[in-house]
């Protein structure tokens, strides 16, 4: 079987990458990096709708330019009253975090799989798609607090809010813990250690919405069950100036189906006809189903208000050399890139919490 070069692997990762050969070491040139990143954005329903920024520097600022409202003034012939409207400038600071996705394929697999010589291409395409899915997951759910997780020790004391790892699971203490054996009654399980290693990369939009946007607790509305008032309360939390037809509900497929079940039950019990438009557009705002979004929140914003920043520093490497490759008869691959997740206007966001479990 003919060995494939770094360039061939990059071309397999994205069929749109057809520009000149790679620089040494698998680094993509700016045009290749742009096309590769674009392919990862196309892998998920939300990523293709958000704002993308490609920068040469890994840290920096993104300009925000805007104008105020009610700027018009009455004109008086042959008179300059000295009035001038202004332009509002702002900055979004970003700092891209490096991430990687490594994988390996044995030479035996390459020789004997049913896909034949296309196997390497198929796997690389799958990995490229997974990069897009994982990045969207991080953009939504990332939380840098998981970097503070420490292995539980019976000789240590822990305060409320501390994070510990125990039996490969992560817990947050809800009560102070004195030295002694681990007691699950003092803490809430948050996920696995692998989840924490993944989520600690960056702070995602869910966390940013909760810390700086409009938080709408609906636990007091029908015990958090899906009703129409949930959406209207969320919509009222966002200032009218942002309610200009570009807002979208972001929710998990399960949450979207729970809303559909509620509205159909209403039609059955109360009578009447529910159009698809009413199901698909609660409070006249379209829904975007986002598989990576947790079931316990609903987000409201213009997708273009969500920003993902990448640098051009994308590297795709493959090696068939070195002791491991020789002794284990394997090929090793890795994709390196970086990103940051921002919200341009937190005032233009709402997040609905306190929803009943489904």
Each predicted region: which residue ranges?
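Short, flexible beta-strand-to-coil junctions
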Residues: 166-168, 174-176, 253-255, 302-304, ...
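Tryptophan-rich substrate-binding surfaces of secreted polymer-degrading and adhesive proteins
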Residues: 148-196
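Alpha-helical scaffold segments that mediate packing/assembly in large oligomeric complexes
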Residues: 107-151, 155, 159, 192-237, ...
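Short, polar loop/linker segments at the starts of domains and inter-domain junctions
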Residues: 79, 122, 181-188, 219-225, ...
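Sequence/fold signature of self-assembling virion shell proteins
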Residues: 2-20, 24-43, 53, 58, ...
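Assembly/oligomerization interface modules of large self-assembling protein complexes
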Residues: 20-104, 124-125
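Beta-edge loop/turn motif
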Residues: 245-257
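Intrinsically disordered or highly flexible coil/loop and linker segments, enriched in small
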Residues: 46, 132-144, 244, 268, ...
């Amino acid at each position: 079987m003919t060995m494939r070069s770094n360039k061939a692997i990059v071309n397999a990762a994205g069929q749109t990458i057809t520009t000149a050969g790679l620089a040494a070491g698998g680094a993509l040139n700016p045009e290749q990096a742009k096309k590769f990143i674009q392919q990862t954005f196309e892998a998920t329903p939300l990523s293709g709708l958000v704002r993308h920024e490609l920068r040469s520097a890994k840290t920096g600022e993104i300009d925000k330019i805007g104008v105020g409202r009610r700027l018009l003034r009455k004109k008086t012939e042959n008179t300059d009253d000295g009035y001038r409207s202004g332009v509002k400038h702002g900055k979004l600071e970003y700092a891209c975090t490096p991430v990687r996705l490594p994988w390996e394929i044995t030479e035996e697999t390459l020789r004997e799989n049913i896909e034949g010589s296309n196997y390497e291409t198929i796997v690389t395409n799958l990995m490229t798609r997974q990069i897009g899915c994982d990045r969207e997951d991080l953009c939504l759910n990332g939380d840098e607090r998981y970097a503070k997780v420490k292995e539980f020790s019976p000789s240590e004391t822990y305060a409320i809010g501390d994070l510990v790892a125990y039996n490969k699971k992560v817990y947050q203490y809800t009560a102070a813990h004195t030295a002694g054996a681990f007691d699950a009654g003092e803490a809430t399980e948050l996920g696995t250690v692998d989840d924490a290693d993944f989520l600690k990369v960056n702070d995602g939009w869910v966390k940013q919405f909760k810390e700086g946007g409009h938080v709408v607790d609906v636990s007091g509305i029908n015990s958090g069950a899906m009703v129409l008032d949930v959406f209207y309360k969320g919509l009222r939390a966002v200032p009218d100036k942002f309610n200009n037809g570009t807002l979208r509900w972001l929710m998990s497929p399960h949450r979207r189906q729970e809303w559909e079940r509620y509205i159909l039950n209403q039609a059955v019990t109360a009578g009447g006809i529910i159009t698809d438009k009413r199901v698909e557009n609660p409070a006249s705002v379209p829904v975007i189903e986002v598989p990576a979004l947790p079931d316990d929140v609903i987000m409201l914003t213009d997708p273009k208000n969500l920003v993902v920043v990448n640098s051009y520093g994308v590297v795709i490497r493959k090696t068939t050399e070195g002791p491991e490759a020789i002794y284990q008869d394997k090929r090793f691959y890795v994709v390196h890139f970086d990103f940051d997740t921002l919200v341009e206007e937190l005032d233009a966001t709402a997040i609905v919490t306190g929803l009943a479990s489904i």
